[in-house]
UniProtKB/Swiss-Prot annotation:
It is found in: Cytoplasm. Belongs to the methyltransferase superfamily. RsmH family. InterPro entries: RsmH, SAM-dep_MeTrfase_MraW_recog, SAM-dependent_MTases_sf. It is an enzyme of class 2 (transferase). It comes from Lachnospira eligens (strain ATCC 27750 / DSM 3376 / VPI C15-48 / C15-B4). The keyword Magnesium does not apply. Pfam families: Methyltransf_5. Disulfide bonds: none annotated. SUPFAM superfamilies: Putative methyltransferase TM0872, insert domain (SSF81799), S-adenosyl-L-methionine-dependent methyltransferases (SSF53335). Its main location: cytoplasm. Keywords: Cytoplasm, Methyltransferase, rRNA processing, S-adenosyl-L-methionine, Transferase. The gene is rsmH. This is Ribosomal RNA small subunit methyltransferase H. It comes from the Bacteria. Specifically methylates the N4 position of cytidine in position 1402 (C1402) of 16S rRNA.
Length: 315
């Protein structure tokens, strides 16, 4: 059960998220990215017998760790192995219509990064994997060995925002013609050879952006997020809140745009005196600017550095 201890890293923006969920002791809450249950533990602690918490995660290790962590609250907690994009179905199957709050903490967990065998990290030589759901067949190894040069270029450019995307894609395709790319260190060497030495000397780990791109593509992270926000807002009771923590600008832009669109969905031309499109606001954006970690959290937890919390409230 060693990984249960590993999963106990401090959750990012914990107090800010719990505060913004406005937890009612008898409310129903959903943690769509359960992880090691850092946020969920604090939600469950605040619920009474009438309250309920649904925890969803696609990672088997997370489910095991969270089940252990939330044991003392088991009468009010239901844990489901699934992707949060299927929240509609999960809630329907549990006979739940509306909920009082939903939380998402997007991206890869510290546990996944730190567990070498999961293949998310470029710091340890291991098989290229990066699946958040181990039931999925396709791995990072399959992706780097089968995607066309154009597809690799597109994902590294768009999801990794790497200015050397074209060169990295070219080098990956050339290398795999010799032999399949199997491990993280093999991929690291290919990426390193694609980036000028003087840039490598100053710009952090050369693999960081490419690994992010592969992970996002493999797990369809941005599609899942974009296609789930409206559904989650529809599931909220009046005054219910959706809190989403993101870790890079690609995700944050999606959350900001979807929240804004749900607050003001009107598609009428700006010069129309009255709205005729009939699209009604579903609520309001609570965070005009995202909430970011304070100095204390940044000192305690370096991984919180790029995190942003945005909050939407249903009317």
């Amino acid at each position: 059960m060693g990984f249960i201890m590993e999963f106990k890293h401090k959750s990012v923006l914990l107090e800010e998220t719990i505060d913004n969920l406005n937890i009612k002791p008898d409310g129903i809450y959903v943690d769509g990215t359960l992880g090691g249950a850092g946020h969920s533990y604090q939600i469950a602690k605040r619920l009474t017998g009438g309250g309920r918490l649904i925890g969803i995660d696609q990672d088997a290790d997370a489910i095991a760790a969270a089940t252990e962590r939330l044991k003392e609250f088991e009468e009010r907690v239901t844990i489901v192995r699934n992707n949060y994009c299927n929240m509609d179905k999960v809630l329907d199957e549990l006979g739940i219509d509306k909920v009082d709050g939903i939380l998402l903490d997007i991206g890869v967990s510290s546990y996944q990064l730190d567990t070498a065998s999961r293949g998310f990290t470029y710091n340890v030589d291991t098989a290229l994997d990066m699946r958040m759901d181990q039931r999925q067949e396709m791995t990072a190894k399959d992706l780097v060995n089968t995607y066309s040069e154009m597809e690799l270029f597109r994902i590294i450019r768009d999801y990794g925002e790497d200015r050397f995307a074209k060169n990295i894609a070219k080098h990956i395709v050339a290398a795999r013609k010799e032999k399949p790319i199997e491990t993280t260190f093999e991929l690291n060497e290919i990426i390193k050879a694609s980036i000028p030495a003087k840039v490598r000397a100053t710009g952090g780990h050369p693999s960081k952006r490419t690994y992010q791109a592969i992970r996002i593509e493999l797990n369809r992270e941005l599609d899942v997020l974009e296609n789930s926000i409206d559904m989650m807002i529809d599931r909220l009771n009046p005054q219910g809140r959706l809190c989403i923590i993101t870790f890079h600008s690609l995700e944050d832009r999606i959350v900001k745009a979807r929240f804004r669109n749900n607050e003001n969905p009107c598609t009428c031309p700006p010069d129309f005196p009255v709205c005729v499109c009939g699209k009604k606001s579903k609520g309001k954006v609570i965070t005009r600017k995202p909430i970011v970690p304070g100095d204390e959290e940044l000192n305690e937890n370096q991984r919180s550095k790029s995190s942003k919390l945005r909050v939407f409230e249903r009317i």
